[in-house]
């Protein structure tokens, strides 16, 4: 809870600074919403050694930003994921579970607050091509479950990481004051906390997944 309050306070400070900076400039502010599909990089389960694969998750983000110049803009976004999971069934390779058939699942909860900057690389009559980058805090935790091994499932607590984002996309104006975007983003949300679980007298490491994702999103920006 304290970490969430800290993120909220950071957000308020950044927005206040942005408002003060923009008040002396004749540029428009905008609201934005983005959603789409994402997949995590493959990771190996620490306890069993099973290589986990991602399902398709839904990233969602809301934000506020402003146009600094004709070809440059910045925004602050709050984002999360819906339904993300790393999972796989197979034979364990790590002791004490070697050759045990197991199904491992890691379900993350990720909340990120990013400061983003974008620059238009080219301007065509119908659309623009842009590149961007973002950075900010992310709260990351996960629920870990195993089928085939009793007593190993666990939950990790929230960990605050620094999240990074790189973006390449295109945008087009559909009506005055409204633009749509299609973008690819790579996001690194860092690792979850590691946790040792006692299994039949043996300390077994779990957690510690590194969540990096490839995102394809559609977004819309409304001038305000």
Curated annotation (Swiss-Prot):
Residues 1-22 form the signal peptide. Keywords: Signal. InterPro entries: OMP/PagP_b-brl, OMP_b-brl. This is Putative adhesin A1G_07050. It comes from Rickettsia rickettsii (strain Sheila Smith).
């Amino acid at each position: 809870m304290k970490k969430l309050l800290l993120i909220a306070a950071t957000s308020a400070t950044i927005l206040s600074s942005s408002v003060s900076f923009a008040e002396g400039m004749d540029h428009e502010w905008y609201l934005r919403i983005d959603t789409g599909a994402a997949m995590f990089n493959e990771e190996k389960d620490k306890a069993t050694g099973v290589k986990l694969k991602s399902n398709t998750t839904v990233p969602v983000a809301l934000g506020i930003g402003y146009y600094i110049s004709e070809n440059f803009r910045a925004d602050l976004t709050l984002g999360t994921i819906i339904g993300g999971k790393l999972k796989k069934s197979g034979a364990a390779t790590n002791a004490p579970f070697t050759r045990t058939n197991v199904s491992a699942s890691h379900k993350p909860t990720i909340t990120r607050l990013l400061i983003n900057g974008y620059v238009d690389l080219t301007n065509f009559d119908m659309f623009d091509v842009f590149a961007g980058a973002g950075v900010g805090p992310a709260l990351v935790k996960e629920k870990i479950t195993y089928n085939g091994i009793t007593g190993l499932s666990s939950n990790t607590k929230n960990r605050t990481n620094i999240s990074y984002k790189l973006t390449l996309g295109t945008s087009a104006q559909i009506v005055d004051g409204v633009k749509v975007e299609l973008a690819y983003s790579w996001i690194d949300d860092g690792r979850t906390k590691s946790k040792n679980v006692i299994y039949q007298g043996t300390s077994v490491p779990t957690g510690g997944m590194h969540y990096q994702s490839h995102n394809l999103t559609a977004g819309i920006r409304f001038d305000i």
